[in-house]
Structure formats: structure tokens, C-alpha cells
């Protein structure tokens, strides 16, 4: 699930239980969580476990080379991630290279936002142009990066190609959880 606690943090009312219950009603088989803005604290982590989450992905270590999942005190597996599309372009990095080495001996988690894949965003301006009208397909298509400057979609396709060529192992998050649980 991908709860958005930002309205609560802005004082706009609501409560975390209602947000989580609504999501679990819609996605009763969900077993992992990453919050909008990576919002977390001890109470929320315990609440995630209470509603049936097995793992969470709210810990961002940009470009870190030695990722390793670990168990939290509440019984959730924390799976850190080391690359995110909007962070990459916030630093004004080129999408010619993700800045992370892919090899058999490294564990990497890449976070891609679907809207940035669709727009092939190379900067945040593309998203800001459509943010308030994302149901408008014409507007979305007008703001897609189809030029020579590489963007989010391009780097995703490049990573998938590299993984295929190197026969890299890719896993779903539930499989990362199962692998780690079997080691514990």
C-alpha cells in the first residue's frame, strides 16, 4: 500500500487509522508499505505490522552501494532503497546513467513513479505541468519527453536491458521478504 499521510501533517484533518483501513479495504492482500514522502515513525511502523504488513520501504539511502534488508523491532522487514527517479532529477543528474553499479554482488532497489515513466521525466517541470489535471490524456501526451534528452522511462528501459544482458536476478518485494525470512 502507499498511504498518504501528508494531509495529516499539514493539519488538514483525518487520522492514520482511517487512511490505512481504507487502503486495506481496497487491497486486502497487500503485505508491503511505502508511504508518500516516506512518512514513518515508531507508532506507524507498529501500526503497519498490526494491519498485516510484512515489509516496509520507507528508508532511502541515495546511491548507497551496500544495501541490506533488516528486521525492525516490531517484526517488519525494512527494505531500504537506493535510487529514485525524482531524486535523480532533483540533483540535476543525467539520465544517461543511473549512478549505481549493477552486478551479481550488489543488492539495489530502484523506485520509479509511474507518472515519471509515462512522461519520461528528466526534471520536475514535466510533472508540475500536469499535476493538477492528470486525468487529461491530451495534456499528459503534450508533456511527454520524446526528444533526445533521456528521462525516467529511458533509464528504466536501459536498466531492464542491462539486467537481461547480465542475467541479473530481479525479485518482487515479497520474494525479498521470503529470502530474508529464510535466512533468519
Pin down the residues of each PLM region.
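Terminal accessory/targeting
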Residues: 21, 25-29, 42-54, 59-184
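Metal-dependent polysaccharide deacetylase catalytic core of the NodB/CE4 family, i.e.
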Residues: 1-46, 110
Amino acid at each position: 500500500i502507499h498511504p498518504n499521510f501528508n494531509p495529516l501533517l499539514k493539519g488538514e484533518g483525518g487520522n492514520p487509522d482511517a487512511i490505512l483501513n481504507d487502503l486495506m479495504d481496497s487491497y486486502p492482500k497487500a503485505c508491503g508499505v511505502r508511504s508518500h514522502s516516506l512518512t514513518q515513525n515508531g507508532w506507524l511502523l507498529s501500526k503497519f505490522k498490526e494491519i498485516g504488513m510484512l515489509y516496509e520501504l520507507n528508508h532511502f539511502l541515495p546511491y548507497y552501494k551496500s544495501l541490506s534488508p533488516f528486521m525492525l523491532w516490531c517484526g517488519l522487514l525494512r527494505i531500504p532503497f537506493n535510487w529514485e527517479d525524482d531524486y535523480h532529477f532533483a540533483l540535476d543528474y543525467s539520465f544517461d546513467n543511473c549512478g549505481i553499479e549493477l552486478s551479481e554482488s550488489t543488492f539495489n532497489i530502484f523506485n520509479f513513479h509511474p507518472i515519471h515513466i509515462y512522461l519520461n521525466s528528466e526534471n520536475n517541470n514535466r510533472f508540475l505541468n500536469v499535476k493538477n489535471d492528470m486525468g487529461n490524456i491530451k495534456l499528459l501526451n503534450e508533456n511527454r519527453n520524446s526528444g533526445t534528452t533521456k528521462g525516467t522511462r529511458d533509464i528504466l528501459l536501459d536498466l531492464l536491458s542491462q539486467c537481461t544482458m547480465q542475467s541479473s536476478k530481479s525479485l518482487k518485494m515479497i520474494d525479498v521478504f521470503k529470502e530474508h525470512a529464510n535466512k533468519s
